[in-house]
Amino acid sequence: MARYLGPKCRLSRREKTDLQLKSGIRAIDSKCNIERIPGMHWQRRGRTTDYGVQLRMKQMIKRYYDVLEKQFANYYKQADRLKGSTGDNLLKLLESRLDNVVYRMGFSATRAEARQLISHKAILVNGEVVNIPSYQVKPGDIIEVRSRAKGQLRIKGALELAQQRAPISWIEVDTKKMTGTFKEQPDVAELPAEFKVNLVVELYSK
């Protein structure tokens, strides 16, 4: 499946929550009514089945991390093989993607922008260029904006926007040096309360 290139607002409206797909310069509800799902007859939608609820949750999490269907399925398989809760493992794997970590550290305004920075070799991991957005960051890894990219206005702007977001316990960032440390495995308790990942587990367990 190709990556969605349409209006980001439409995806947030579909899931009835802010998926953080836009830069955050303006509040999402300033032009995007997330309470109204896309379509002309949105008020006539019928009762959702259990399968429909499970599918919607999978779509919400998949779109939040901006990954493709096949990628998401592979993450689930990997999470299911690991010890512990499959649902928690799934969220930890998604949170540990390099594009997500770059976004969390505030070096980009969106995950899509983070992927672009990584693909353009503007990000270092432990001093080495990594241009794979899906690269799994490990505890102790140091993420840094490459020297030649530190003057980019979009990165400086993203760092300013990041100050408005709630801090994340598993990362530590030096905004002046544009470096950050992935201190430990993500704490799923700090992720959006809307994520009922048990529904995704139920969906894939069928």
Swiss-Prot record:
Pfam families: Ribosomal_S4, S4. GO terms for cellular component: small ribosomal subunit. This is Small ribosomal subunit protein uS4. One of the primary rRNA binding proteins, it binds directly to 16S rRNA where it nucleates assembly of the body of the 30S subunit. It comes from the Bacteria. Keywords: Ribonucleoprotein, Ribosomal protein, RNA-binding, rRNA-binding. Part of the 30S ribosomal subunit. Contacts protein S5. The interaction surface between S4 and S5 is involved in control of translational fidelity. CDD domains: S4 (cd00165). InterPro entries: Ribosomal_uS4, Ribosomal_uS4_bac-type, Ribosomal_uS4_CS, Ribosomal_uS4_N, S4_RNA-bd, S4_RNA-bd_sf. SMART domains: Ribosomal_S4, S4. One of its GO terms (biological process) is translation. Residues 96-158 form the S4 RNA-binding domain. HAMAP family: Ribosomal_uS4_B. One of its GO terms (molecular function) is structural constituent of ribosome. Belongs to the universal ribosomal protein uS4 family. It comes from Coxiella burnetii (strain CbuK_Q154) (Coxiella burnetii (strain Q154)).
